[in-house]
């Protein structure tokens, strides 16, 4: 991707400043300089241990706090606490915004706008971040908890093998939990009602997600389940 400044996006955002564009003239100059060093007996290794030692001046991953085993054994609730505002800011600040269409975005089955909503968290715009999450995901508050991020978006994070992947799932959970607690609800004011009616059998995540997509399209939806509560395996 090319930025408005005329440079390539990868060059601008490279955390180690290891990339630069070279033309034929520049490559020839490097070649001649190396030949002269070799002729003078001053040839040196291209290895840069100092570069690897200083790789990525980004804070290490912390993630969400985990409830102790002594407490977990007494219930079947969630074992990870949600991020607080300070933790969310810490994790969002770690994102290097490696590209407009970053690896995390491509590896997400829903192609969520991950770098964009992380930037909104960084700016404190939680409602806007929730709106963005909901544009591509029917259940972002659920996906933030149970989606296997370690082999999808977080598994593709640029920082994974260095300071640890950004905790994308925890940030998604933080966004939606916080927005819902603030009273936010998805905006359905622009939905145009249609005459079609659909019955969805099963009130698990798949059924609820299906009903959400249909409802956004204006279809009248009824969800049925044999259990008294929605959620299925959740």
What does each of the following model-derived ranges do?
Residues 32-33, 212, 233-234:
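Short acidic, glycine/serine/threonine-rich loops at helix termini
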Residues 1-197:
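Ferredoxin-type iron-sulfur electron-transfer modules and their immediate structural context
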Residues 11, 211, 231:
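Short glycine-/small-residue-rich flexible loop motifs, especially phosphate/cofactor-binding loops
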Residues 152, 209, 232:
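Conserved SAM/SAH-binding loop-helix junction
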Residues 197-222:
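N-terminal Rossmann-like FAD-binding beta1-loop-alpha1 element of flavoenzymes
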Residues 138, 204-205, 229:
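Residue-level detector of alpha-helix initiation sites
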Residues 219-232:
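Glycine-rich FAD pyrophosphate-binding loop
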Residues 117, 205, 232-233:
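Gly/Ser/Thr-rich helix-start
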């Amino acid at each position: 991707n090319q930025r408005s400044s005329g440079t390539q996006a990868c060059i601008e955002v490279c955390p180690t400043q290891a990339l630069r564009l070279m033309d034929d003239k520049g490559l020839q100059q490097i070649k001649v300089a190396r030949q002269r060093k070799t002729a003078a007996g001053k040839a040196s290794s291209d290895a840069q241990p100092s570069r690897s030692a200083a790789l990525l001046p980004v804070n290490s991953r912390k993630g969400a706090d985990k409830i102790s085993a002594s407490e977990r054994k007494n219930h079947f609730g969630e074992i990870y606490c949600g991020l607080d505002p300070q933790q969310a800011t810490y994790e969002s600040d770690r994102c290097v915004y490696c590209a407009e269409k970053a690896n995390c975005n491509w590896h997400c089955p829903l192609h969520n706008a991950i770098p964009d909503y992380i930037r909104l968290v960084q700016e404190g715009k939680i409602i806007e971040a929730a709106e963005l999450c909901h544009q591509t995901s029917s259940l972002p508050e659920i996906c933030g908890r149970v989606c296997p991020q370690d082999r999808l978006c977080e598994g593709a994070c640029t920082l994974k093998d260095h300071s640890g992947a950004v905790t994308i799932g925890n940030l998604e959970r933080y966004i939606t939990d916080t927005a819902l607690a603030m009273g936010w609800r998805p905006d359905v004011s622009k939905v145009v009602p249609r005459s079609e009616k659909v019955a969805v059998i099963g009130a698990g995540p798949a059924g609820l997600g299906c009903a959400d997509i249909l409802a956004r399209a204006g279809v009248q939806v009824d969800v049925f389940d044999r259990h008294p509560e929605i959620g299925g395996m959740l």
